[in-house]
């Protein structure tokens, strides 16, 4: 395949056109008064969104050189979204400003490599300034504020996420699903839940709701099948003497062992529920170990030389309550040692850091949540499918932003933190083209606040100058159109989002500034049309088959 090669100014100018086309489409969504973008879909209804990364992902340009520029800026927003979950529009605006200002200087004769050094030094100074302004999240109200801002000032979503985080803790799992109704609701499963139900419906304690609820039970955790009654009879007798119910978690309970449990449960001799162990293979062993640590019991494993018939009550786990339905088992308030549970949580966190597989990370995260607090599900409801998709995307954004805020704290929002970082950049002692590189970042840092106010129908430059003169956290609230303390007004951004947006924008911006040659595939004008030659009659010569 022949290639098109462009050099110097021509190459950079085409890349810049692509950058501007994408950035101009994305930046209209910024701020509380940002506008929607409607995206046509080949199948189904069009998507209406105010999410920068969703807009960016849809953009493909016809000109291959322009498209290269657009794809590089798309990388800024997707990387920021992956790392921090929000701030994609801000990152795109910063990248556009860095690239536009930078290319003006390169055209005027500045050395691109020196500009890059200056940009890197300025970004380091700005990031330090952002981190200094960060305030740790103290309460539920702060979480609600962060989530509301990220969900485009939707307080309902903000409060739901704050409730969910409050209930399951920062290590808990919060998932987002589509609701069957138009209401958006929150369901919280406290304790450890896994997707295995009772082996026999005869084990239920409430025939109406078909649920088995056992209060203060013993929990037997065994990693093999139980089929022989003689293995089990000894422990059943001890549990019956103690006057407590029993939960059996094992690979399988079958044959005479199952029959004996069912008969004794129906006769009310003992209240016992058997469930299959969750997971498969090595993951099953890990999950059984988690349950054992949570309940203060032991996994009865023949690999460790333990036999089921020799099990004592001290080897069994305990919990305040266990509920089992047809599909799920929930262990509430396991009576394990806090120190051991914390040790296990630390171990899983380390595995999450070390793993390279996304699937493994997800499964480890689930295990962590089950040990640490629980699982919350936000059911997103809306009147139409189009609204549902848009709302669900906002909830997912808000959730990611909230996690980022818990991690690195919050900073004043509305573009104020980036604007105030100009002070740190301005105080750098640099010379020549490095100083010019720092000035490029200095100029870019005021672009987000300029765009937020511009989308609100005001003159951005005027607001920028006023904001520079203000002290502390006082900034312009584009939603209420007043000057106020941004933190007190609840206009906050996660520090991680602001930091990631700037670092990713500067990274891609520097790449484009230091580009000297572009190589693209040359369109093949003489390529044969695969449908030509078939003629208007389709598959000729088939008439005889009628």
Swiss-Prot record:
<keyword id="KW-0547">Nucleotide-binding</keyword>
<dbReference type="Pfam" id="PF00118">
    <property type="entry name" value="Cpn60_TCP1"/>
</dbReference>
<dbReference type="InterPro" id="IPR018370">
    <property type="entry name" value="Chaperonin_Cpn60_CS"/>
</dbReference>
<keyword id="KW-0413">Isomerase</keyword>
<dbReference type="InterPro" id="IPR027409">
    <property type="entry name" value="GroEL-like_apical_dom_sf"/>
</dbReference>
<keyword id="KW-0963">Cytoplasm</keyword>
<dbReference type="GO" id="GO:0016853">
    <property type="term" value="F:isomerase activity"/>
</dbReference>
<dbReference type="GO" id="GO:0042026">
    <property type="term" value="P:protein refolding"/>
</dbReference>
<feature type="binding site">
    <location>
        <begin position="29"/>
        <end position="32"/>
    </location>
    <ligand>
        <name>ATP</name>
    </ligand>
</feature>
<dbReference type="InterPro" id="IPR027410">
    <property type="entry name" value="TCP-1-like_intermed_sf"/>
</dbReference>
<comment type="similarity">
    <text>Belongs to the chaperonin (HSP60) family.</text>
</comment>
<comment type="subunit">
    <text>Forms a cylinder of 14 subunits composed of two heptameric rings stacked back-to-back. Interacts with the co-chaperonin GroES.</text>
</comment>
<feature type="binding site">
    <location>
        <position position="414"/>
    </location>
    <ligand>
        <name>ATP</name>
    </ligand>
</feature>
<protein>
    <recommendedName>
        <fullName>Chaperonin GroEL</fullName>
        <ecNumber>5.6.1.7</ecNumber>
    </recommendedName>
</protein>
<dbReference type="GO" id="GO:0051082">
    <property type="term" value="F:unfolded protein binding"/>
</dbReference>
<keyword id="KW-0067">ATP-binding</keyword>
<keyword id="KW-0143">Chaperone</keyword>
<dbReference type="InterPro" id="IPR002423">
    <property type="entry name" value="Cpn60/GroEL/TCP-1"/>
</dbReference>
<dbReference type="InterPro" id="IPR027413">
    <property type="entry name" value="GROEL-like_equatorial_sf"/>
</dbReference>
<dbReference type="GO" id="GO:0140662">
    <property type="term" value="F:ATP-dependent protein folding chaperone"/>
</dbReference>
<dbReference type="GO" id="GO:0005524">
    <property type="term" value="F:ATP binding"/>
</dbReference>
<dbReference type="GO" id="GO:0005737">
    <property type="term" value="C:cytoplasm"/>
</dbReference>
<comment type="function">
    <text>Together with its co-chaperonin GroES, plays an essential role in assisting protein folding. The GroEL-GroES system forms a nano-cage that allows encapsulation of the non-native substrate proteins and provides a physical environment optimized to promote and accelerate protein folding.</text>
</comment>
<feature type="binding site">
    <location>
        <begin position="86"/>
        <end position="90"/>
    </location>
    <ligand>
        <name>ATP</name>
    </ligand>
</feature>
<dbReference type="InterPro" id="IPR001844">
    <property type="entry name" value="Cpn60/GroEL"/>
</dbReference>
<feature type="binding site">
    <location>
        <position position="50"/>
    </location>
    <ligand>
        <name>ATP</name>
    </ligand>
</feature>
<feature type="binding site">
    <location>
        <position position="493"/>
    </location>
    <ligand>
        <name>ATP</name>
    </ligand>
</feature>
<keyword id="KW-0346">Stress response</keyword>
<feature type="binding site">
    <location>
        <begin position="477"/>
        <end position="479"/>
    </location>
    <ligand>
        <name>ATP</name>
    </ligand>
</feature>
């Amino acid at each position: 395949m022949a290639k098109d090669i462009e050099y110097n100014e021509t190459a950079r100018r085409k890349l810049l056109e692509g950058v501007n086309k994408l950035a101009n489409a994305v930046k209209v969504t910024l701020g509380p008064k940002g506008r929607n973008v409607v995206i046509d879909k080949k199948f189904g209804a069009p998507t209406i969104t105010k999410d920068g990364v969703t807009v960016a992902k849809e953009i493909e340009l016809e000109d291959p050189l322009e498209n290269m520029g657009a794809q590089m800026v798309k990388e800024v927003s997707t990387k920021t979204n992956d790392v921090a979950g929000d701030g994609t529009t801000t990152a795109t605006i910063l990248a556009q400003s860095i690239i536009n200002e930078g290319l003006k200087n390169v055209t005027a004769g500045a050395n691109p490599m020196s500009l890059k050094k200056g940009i890197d030094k300025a970004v380091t100074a700005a990031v330090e300034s952002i981190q200094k302004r960060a305030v740790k999240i103290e309460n539920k109200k702060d979480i609600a504020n962060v989530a509301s801002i990220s969900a485009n000032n939707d307080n309902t979503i903000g409060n739901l996420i704050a409730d969910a985080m409050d209930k399951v803790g920062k290590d808990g799992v919060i998932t987002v699903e589509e609701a069957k109704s138009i209401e958006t609701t929150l369901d919280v499963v406290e304790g450890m839940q896994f997707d295995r139900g009772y082996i026999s419906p005869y084990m239920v304690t409430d025939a109406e709701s078909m649920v088995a609820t056992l209060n203060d039970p013993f929990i037997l955790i065994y990693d093999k099948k139980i089929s022989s009654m003689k293995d089990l009879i000894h422990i059943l007798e001890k549990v019956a003497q103690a006057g407590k119910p029993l939960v059996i978690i094992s690979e399988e309970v079958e044959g005479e062992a199952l029959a004996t449990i069912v008969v004794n449960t129906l006769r009310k001799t003992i209240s016992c529920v058997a469930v299959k162990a969750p997971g498969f293979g090595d993951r099953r062993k890990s999950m059984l170990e988690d349950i054992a640590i949570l309940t203060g019991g032991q996994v009865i494993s023949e690999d460790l030389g333990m036999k089921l018939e020799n099990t004592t009550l001290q080897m069994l786990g305990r919990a305040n309550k266990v509920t089992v339905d047809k599909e799920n088992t929930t262990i509430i308030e396991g009576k394990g040692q806090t120190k051991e549970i914390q040790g296990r949580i630390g171990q899983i966190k380390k595995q999450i850091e070390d793993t390279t597989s996304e699937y493994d990370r997800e499964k480890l995260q689930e295990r962590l949540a089950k040990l640490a607090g629980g699982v919350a599900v936000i059911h997103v409801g809306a009147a139409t499918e189009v609204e549902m998709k848009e709302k669900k995307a906002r909830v997912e954004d808000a959730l990611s932003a909230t996690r980022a805020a818990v991690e690195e704290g919050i900073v004043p929002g509305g573009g104020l933190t980036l604007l105030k970082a100009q002070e740190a950049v301005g105080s750098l002692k640099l010379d020549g083209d490095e100083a010019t590189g720092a000035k490029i970042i200095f100029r870019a840092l005021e672009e987000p606040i300029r765009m937020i106010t511009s989308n609100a129908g005001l003159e951005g430059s005027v607001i920028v100058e006023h904001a520079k003169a203000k002290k502390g956290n006082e900034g312009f609230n584009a939603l209420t159109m007043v000057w106020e303390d941004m933190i007190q007004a609840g206009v906050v951004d996660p520090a991680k989002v602001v930091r990631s947006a700037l670092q990713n924008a500067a990274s891609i911006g520097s790449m484009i500034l230091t580009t000297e040659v572009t190589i693209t595939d040359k369109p093949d004008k003489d390529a044969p049309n695969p449908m030509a030659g078939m003629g208007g009659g389709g598959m000729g010569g088939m008439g005889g088959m009628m």
